[in-house]
Amino acid sequence: YTIPAEIVYPKYFHKRGMFAAARTGDDENPERASSATQFYIVTGKFFTEMELDKMEKEQGITFTPKQRQAYMLEGGTPHLDGKYTIFGEVVSGMKAVDKIQFTETNADDRPVKNIKIKSMKIVNK
């Protein structure tokens, strides 16, 4: 079961703490439809201005000032921008996300022990 892509780029981009819907690759999913049951939380890395300039030149993209600031100060995964549906953001609790990131995983990159989100709050901005 999939849901249609809702890619709103560059308004929503892959800065640290964003929730995005997982999906299969472009070859088998050119519409970029999202999984209805799987998601990921962006952790990523910090980027320098030179690294972002290089990405722009090599990939023919342009980062907004907001994106540049976020990728340099917060980190993220800019190579995923415009390719996945982003639907939320962690506004507090990134320490818990960091723990999840470093959890032991199996050969399929799934946690050896299930991880459950016991509580969350939806905040409208």
Description of each model-found segment:
Residues 1-125:
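Cross-family detector of peptidyl-prolyl cis-trans isomerase
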